Amino acid sequence: MIKRRGNVEIRVYYESVRTLRSRSHLKPSDRQQSPGHRVFPGSPGFRDHPENLGNPEYRELPETPGYRVTPGIHDNPGSPGLPGSPGPHAPPANHVRLAGLYSPGKYAPLASPDPFSPQDGAYARARVGLHTAVRVPPTGSPTHTHLRHDPGDEPTSDDSGLYPLDARALAHLVMLPADHRAFFRTVVEVSRMCAANVRDPPPPATGAMLGRHARLVHTQWLRANQETSPLWPWRTAAINFITTMAPRVQTHRHMHDLLMACAFWCCLTHASTCSYAGLYSTHCLHLFGAFGCGDPALTPPLC
């Protein structure tokens, strides 16, 4: 239709409006099954609704990846619908655009959210276990912890004379036979090590090592001295004590007695000129009475 207003030509187009079908013939149960019930586009009940049967726009809706009808869910009218839905015709949980409509609602994911993402910060995080909880010291307690020493670890007056063999004892090497020097050097080094770590228990493996080394050098000495030697009873007493004590070292007193017996065995080869004779007289007296070195006990007369 063309209208003229002065020198202006106006073209007016009219579009026929489709009259709405009367809903009077529908039963109330068909129009509204329950208060607040609404059929959403894209649902199986939307296409079968009497109002939309003749509408070509909703006759065939394309199946979108976000909406797929699960077989068997909507076949039964009494079916509860999708999991988590309030009614038999609940809207799809996925947020897809169906027939020009968009559902603004957002459902919480079923999987565990990332606790470090900002959008999931409202989710409850796992509780900290008791074994990982930080223990707070009680009020009034000191903020720092002092190491507590066992009084038994402190050196006593009885232990003050332990391990007298030091670096000066290495001067004996030049006066010992060549086959005795390695053993004596080992004895001095172990004595220095134990003196520096007197607060810790002596290592048992060290005592066993000294026992093996002592038996080796004693066997070599016996093979080289087939004839009777005046040193035989003294060295026999020393090696017997070493063999017995070596596997049983538990305290520093045990290790001290073992080392002094080993050094005494070595220094017997220059007993007349040894500068440590007074030291052995103090620390090795137990060897003579323990193994019968000396005059045999006299049998008391019968009458």
From Swiss-Prot:
Residues 20-97, 134-160 are annotated as: Disordered. InterPro entries: EHV_Unk. Phosphorylated. A zinc finger (unnamed) spans 262-274. Pfam families: Gene66. The keyword Plastid does not apply. GO terms for cellular component: host cell nuclear matrix; viral tegument. It is found in: Virion tegument; Host nucleus matrix. Residues 46-62 have a biased composition (Basic and acidic residues). Keywords: Host nucleus, Late protein, Metal-binding, Virion, Virion tegument, Zinc, Zinc-finger. It comes from the Viruses. One of its GO terms (molecular function) is zinc ion binding. Induction: Expressed late in the infection cycle. Its main location: virion. Belongs to the herpesviridae US10 family. This is Virion protein US10. It comes from Human herpesvirus 1 (strain F) (HHV-1).
